């Protein structure tokens, strides 16, 4: 009985909510991390114009299928979407806004690796319309980063975090917990260092 009441009220609330959350997948990476099971691929080169056209065509199709909605969030994931040209990011954001409009306070997130090459693009990514970056630190221990197959070291990760905080209104980061042999005290030290 309580479940039926709960389902009816949730269903009514969902029917009244015309918001839309978009996920945009960029499947390319510079290298494949050994722990990653996401749809991601290492490629020497990517036809950027072809991918941009495909993303915009897919977005236009979805806009026709889902009219009358407002975008509450866009999440660029991957792969490594910080490798996406900022012009493509801006084009997708612009097409989404033109198709649906944005809800107040729309959050537009892009996942990024903390390599210095990618961190140097944070200003351009923010100018494209991204207001939150999710930084894949994964660890703040150089031996753990090597074990995880990451391309950056601790210092580069912390510099990228600082750069991200200067470029974006909102920043989050990933730290992998319960790595083989990791003690709780080590996790706490890494977390405290990232939050400092």
What are these model-derived regions, one by one?
Residues 16, 26-27, 163-165:
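Short glycine/proline-enriched loop/turn "hinge" motifs that connect secondary-structure elements
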């Amino acid at each position: 009985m309580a479940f039926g009441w709960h389902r009816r009220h949730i269903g009514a609330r969902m029917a009244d909510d015309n918001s839309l959350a978009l996920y945009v997948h960029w499947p390319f990476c510079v290298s494949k991390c050994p722990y990653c099971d996401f749809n991601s691929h290492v490629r020497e080169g990517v036809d950027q114009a072809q991918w941009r056209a495909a993303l915009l065509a897919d977005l236009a199709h979805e806009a026709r299928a889902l009219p009358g909605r407002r975008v509450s969030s866009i999440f660029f994931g991957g792969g490594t979407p910080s490798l996406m040209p900022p012009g493509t990011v801006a084009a997708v954001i612009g097409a989404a806004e033109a198709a649906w409009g944005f809800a107040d306070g729309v959050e537009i997130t892009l996942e990024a690796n903390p390599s210095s090459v990618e961190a140097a693009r944070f200003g351009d990514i923010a100018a494209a319309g991204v207001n939150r970056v999710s930084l894949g630190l994964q660890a703040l221990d150089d031996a753990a980063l090597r074990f995880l197959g990451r391309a950056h070291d601790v210092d580069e990760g912390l510099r990228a975090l600082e750069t991200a905080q200067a470029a974006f209104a909102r920043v989050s980061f990933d730290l992998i917990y319960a790595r083989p042999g990791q003690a709780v005290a080590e996790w706490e030290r890494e977390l405290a260092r990232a939050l400092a």
